[in-house]
């Protein structure tokens, strides 16, 4: 890491001591320290969450590097580094000289590519940890997922003390568990390397490439007719700006003296909503019909399981991507919402955007997907 006080600054300090102008010296040193603390890198900054994070960091006065495998935006305020996070040679220049790294790179959960998840989420993250240490980075903030404790059964107001899932619902979750364990296990205050993990759930908002587009595509294809279960299961959906806010709070509160190091924190909108109510509001906001027929949860789950087995059998010949997998049925038909109390107490977290405002802004941002009646 670059020295906190450069050689010219040391000369200035020496001269100032001779003139007994110590207040100016202290002010200059403090300014240097503040500037260093606000130098960061966003790994995965071209993605959905990453772009929103970069925008909020810039608005708060941070100097931002972006590291990504693809160029997702062009912003002259940002230093962009193109590369593979599994390559230390690619990654090191983007981390050298920064105080904080936000690691939010991951393949989308829907990709279902086991090898890709393992390579990026686990192998890549281990490389991030080692390269951070080599580059002198002091803080590593990981974007994890609340799904690391979800096994397809109800979770109501779940806390971070719940154990990791013994039977993760998909490859994404399986590798996020490995990833989070690696990052939290690397926390080392004695060597001035501090880590924490943010666990959002159901991220949505403007420019979302997954939830809303996939939902609308399913509606257009006539696949959003049925509610799985009774439709009363509460779920956490989290507006992207609230997720970013949680990351930045964690970075700013993380220190040797804080209780954040080596711990995970749930970050949600703190307003659990029935899963099907959320989807219905998005659909009707874009002029699509809400699902109105009900199918028992157990029927949907076993049908999805049977279909998945069939897809596995014929996969050497035909490649199919079923809409409702057992994982998606579990996500759609069970309770899974999480407590933010730890984040509230440790870092003063409160959602910045309410669910009503978040949904309105999201719907307005996808007007191009609106159905014309």
UniProtKB/Swiss-Prot annotation:
Reaction catalysis annotation: a 3beta-hydroxysteroid-4alpha-carboxylate + NADP(+) = a 3-oxosteroid + CO2 + NADPH; a 3beta-hydroxysteroid-4alpha-carboxylate + NAD(+) = a 3-oxosteroid + CO2 + NADH; 4alpha-carboxyzymosterol + NADP(+) = zymosterone + CO2 + NADPH; 4alpha-carboxy-4beta-methyl-5alpha-cholest-8-en-3beta-ol + NADP(+) = 4alpha-methyl-5alpha-cholest-8-en-3-one + CO2 + NADPH
EC number annotated for this UniProt entry: 1.1.1.170
Biological processes, Gene Ontology terms: cholesterol biosynthetic process; cholesterol metabolic process; hair follicle development; labyrinthine layer blood vessel development; smoothened signaling pathway
Pathway(s) where this gene product acts: Steroid biosynthesis; zymosterol biosynthesis; zymosterol from lanosterol: step 4/6
Subunit record text: Homodimer.
Disease: Congenital hemidysplasia with ichthyosiform erythroderma and limb defects: An X-linked dominant disorder of lipid metabolism with disturbed cholesterol biosynthesis, which typically results in male lethality. Clinically, it is characterized by congenital, unilateral, ichthyosisform erythroderma with striking lateralization, sharp midline demarcation, and ipsilateral limb defects and hypoplasia of the body. Limbs defects range from hypoplasia of digits or ribs to complete amelia, often including scoliosis.
Designated name of the protein: Sterol-4-alpha-carboxylate 3-dehydrogenase, decarboxylating
Record gene name: NSDHL
